[in-house]
């Protein structure tokens, strides 16, 4: 019995100490302590300690009685049997540097900011220089005159503005600044209104409504001058004018010097064939189509090895592309075989008035074997503007020589012939008469002293030497007003009716009648 009374007394003492600890905790919370447990538990006042000791000293087992259960909190302490301190009743206690806010528990990561991970830096070096990366480039087109004159940034709109309109002048520029300067210079010189910039999507190249179409002035028909022939019932439909901007001298010199300086580093889709005065480009698979087009317009291509989808030549003239496609589908059994385009071309010629000669090409198409590129070497480039004419004369002679060699080939199939382009391929059968006439017609139109847009005595002398090697006679007496007066020694004795049996064919305006010995 005494043991029970002692235990009850100890329980009472512990309850008193527990009340003291709770009081200290409440005081610490009220004072906003920064960290729990920073302040040590201090002893109570001497008066309270004396009360505890006196109670223990005067305690006797007979005085211990069971304490009735309290149903309500007392004045000095709470009922230990009631849950008076629940999590929802607890005041937030500062336990860290960041203030604890109840709303933070509803935020992601309880309101704690998560630092972003830094991007992993790649240690893999790029295979090619950043300058070699191709970026999209927008060209600007100036339509100087016509019903839709203006500055365009889309070739589709420019083509619609110039297609079928006679006398329209237009030009391509790399930047809007250059285009604006050229347009302002033109309007100032012609004293016309300033040309507006027409972005893509805003060009109104057709009537806006049916009423406007009815009120629009009718299109003037071309005046026909007939001499003894019946006028056609309707005007012929205008042919589609494909946009082929004239190459400038600056563009040509840039490509020329690029070919001379190229050493094969940085681009494995190109290699050059270097001669003493000129370097020609050879384009392999995945070459830049825009560069192929510009080099083609400059007459600086020797060979093209296109992919199966012909993406490298997609900017070449449409008829040339169609001829290549027909060769793949109709002339070879395995359409997956690689092909080549071997080009012999002249180069452009400029005078003070501007461009006087666009390159003329003879293109051979064939099945390509394994491509073994030649080593590209950086060559010395000393050419000046005044040397371009001499270079054009040299390439013109080589062009005529390669064109005359077609007469020695007995098995040729003509894929396409145009005013300034001849495309052919080898054939397993002999050349038919139709293809032979096409070659002769092209030679008649191209081979002359005026090949380069002006009369050139050097071309005439080259033709004279070439004809003499084949047993003919071709003499140039003198040049009068830019035209060569040419007379064949055997012209007087030959028949006057019908075409002369000649292999060296000259343009009709330069040679009234020519004849030479036919060499088999």
Swiss-Prot record:
Classification via Gene3D superfamilies: Ribonuclease H1, N-terminal domain
Top-level taxon of origin: Viruses
InterPro entries the UniProt entry points to: Ribosomal_bL9/RNase_H1_N, RNase_H1_N, RNase_H1_N_sf
Listed GO biological process terms: regulation of translation
Pfam families noted in UniProt: Cauli_VI
GO cellular component term, pick one: host cell cytoplasm
Transmembrane spans: none
Keyword field contains Transmembrane: no
Annotated compartments: Host cytoplasm
Region feature Disordered, mapped onto this chain: 486-520
Key words of the record: Host cytoplasm, Translation regulation
Stretches assigned to coiled coil: none
Note: The inclusion bodies are the site of viral DNA synthesis, virion assembly and accumulation in the infected cell.
Chain's role: Enhances the ribosomal termination-reinitiation event leading to the translation of major open reading frames on the polycistronic viral RNAs.
Protein family according to the UniProt entry: Belongs to the caulimoviridae viroplasmin family.
Protein's recorded name: Transactivator/viroplasmin protein
Lineage, opening ranks: Viruses, Riboviria, Pararnavirae, Artverviricota, Revtraviricetes
